[in-house]
């Protein structure tokens, strides 16, 4: 009897812990921690404000000389860059499938309270077909991300959905406010 009770209890616990949301995120690793209270980057700040949903920011990294920079581009035509500090370099960074194209973060405008989304900046359909990370999405002011190769469009405000293919690769993200810490940890 005790073994049956323990087994049923475990089964109920496991069944209740597997929410639909837990399957919504990619199994691809992504890791990024950025303290915007130190950098005060206006482009990132605009995307991390839940009171201005629909603003999205691409974050990617690149080198200028021997220095690493983080680049921020919003769908509202803002572009900034910040030189990485020693504290930025300490934790392991995995900015999506390809760090040179990065991730896209922002609050969707279709729910209240607004939902923070974090997507890979690669077209998931082209990436799945070729297994190559050569398909950086463009992001428009209306919150639509487009692939120039396959012409598919993805709704950044609506969980990265696509009318005719896979939805965007989605990562877990939290933030403590526009001038707080952005944490992507998948």
Q: What is each of the regions a protein language model found here?
A:
Residues 11, 116, 140-143:
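Residue-level signal for mature regions of secreted extracellular proteins and peptides
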Residues 126, 150-151:
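Short Cys/His-rich metal-coordination motifs, predominantly Zn2+-binding knuckles/fingers
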Residues 132, 154-159:
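Iron-sulfur (Fe-S) cluster-binding segments and ferredoxin-like electron-carrier domains
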Residues 13-17:
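C-terminal motif of bacterial Sec signal peptides marking the signal peptidase cleavage site
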Residues 18-22:
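Bacterial signal peptide processing site
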Residues 138-150, 161-176:
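Short cysteine/histidine-rich metal-coordination sites, predominantly Zn2+-binding motifs
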Residues 23-137, 170-186:
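N-terminal pre-ligand scaffold of iron-sulfur
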Residues 1-6:
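Bacterial N-terminal signal peptides that target proteins for export
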